[in-house]
Amino acid sequence: AGFCCDEQRQGFREFAQQADVFELPLVAGNTRESIAEPGPARDKQYAQLAMYLSGHCHLLLALWDGKPSELMGGTAQVVRYHQTDLLPGVTPGRKRARQLITDYESDLVYQVVCSRDRPGGEPASGLQSLQSFYLTTNPDQPRTEQLPLAYRLMFRRTCEFNRDVAKYAAKIVKSEPKLLRDAVAHRLPDRLLGIASLFRSADFLARHFQVRVHTMLRVTYTLAALMGLAFIFYADVAGFGYMIYVFLALFAFGAVLYAIAVKRDWQRKYLDYRVLAEGLRVQFFWLVAGVSSRMSIQFAHDNFLQKQDVELGWIRNAMRAVSVGPQEEPVPGVFPNPTYVIERWIGDPDASGNRGQIRYFQRQMDQKWRYHQMTTALARLCLWIGIAVTLVLAVLDNRIAESTESVLLVLMGVLPLAAAVREAYAHKKADRELIKQYRFMQRLFCNARAQLAVARDDDERRDVLRALGEAALDEHAEWILMHRERPLEHSWL
């Protein structure tokens, strides 16, 4: 049906042969016999298919007459579910009601208006066959022929990530496959290997742009210190009038460097790619452990980053795309394997080596604490030296040489400048906040390890791993929000 000739029908069959085909599980209570004929059982199966398609697509294509309908699994209900996450008779009303009042980047529908070959099959009032437009939940513009700006930006971010992966493909291949470090991991099902591969790309790119951002910060604050020093010499020391030109040259260099960093979007890419990598890490280990979402047919991380900027929806879209696939068959001794996940993801705080997130967060916390102590010590040192210099000037007053007095005055200007620059640099990197976050995450993983040690069976272990993953995703969302509030700036210069 739907084809005007055998040639079109054959073309469709050839196209269908290129697709990956997999079966969704039967809805609870359904059998193959009960869905063989039209009826409530088959409608529930269609509703499940609708939920799966909606949960794993970036843009829902709806060939629809625009008329509302209460038929379960029908196009009208699929569109409604995609925009509200509510499907009467299937999803609980309160569980997803918050989708109705939040910016939800997965609500976009592209409708092609069509009629039905039956009496009364014309499109809804005001619509004509073959019209096409985007449907959104925006009450001010529910229909638009142009892709809304927020979604355009979101898809642009996806394209930029794909371009970066292609650009650095050779280096990515040479990077360490952190999720596939042993023979057991390489025996995992293909879908999990695909997630590990995407993680490898996102992790490499995040580290690549992190180096650029941190280099940019160090250079910027070094320039700020040098500019301050140049101005002090220009203003307070005779014979250094040319320092004003040094000041301007340093400022110009910093401005050019800042313009390059902003144009190439270094910080945004570093933050986005790091959060994508950490989301994929959770997704990978959940699947290896056999942890499924509470409604396994839906996308497991549908709330990840939902409270942040809609622009960040591209991260969830990437995770959504790589999660598409059939339910994997168990591989004895390999998959599902909660024990493997506990060892590789969580790790052991008492074991040697660097395996697991417990050891990672401990190392990061110790490193940030040392940096914080250095910043505090520098501030105190500068304070006391400044007080000492002030006392010397006050006590000796006119009894010291003019050249010595000039040096002391310069020192009084340089010391607080150095302390201020170091403090600003630490604030920009959010060192204090990260110490607290790393301490929290380290305790979180240690507590999870303790709970897993007394779990009675794999089901209890999966419950703990699910809770741990959800908490980790929440913390990653807080991390990106914290750093987005500290953008690269030229104002310090």
PLM feature spans:
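Generic intrinsically disordered, low-complexity segments enriched for polar/acidic and small residues
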Residues: R9, A19, D43, L130-Q131, ...
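Conserved non-transmembrane functional hotspots
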Residues: T136-L493
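Extended low-complexity acidic/polar segments
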Residues: P123-R143
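Acidic/glycine-enriched connector segments
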Residues: A1-L130
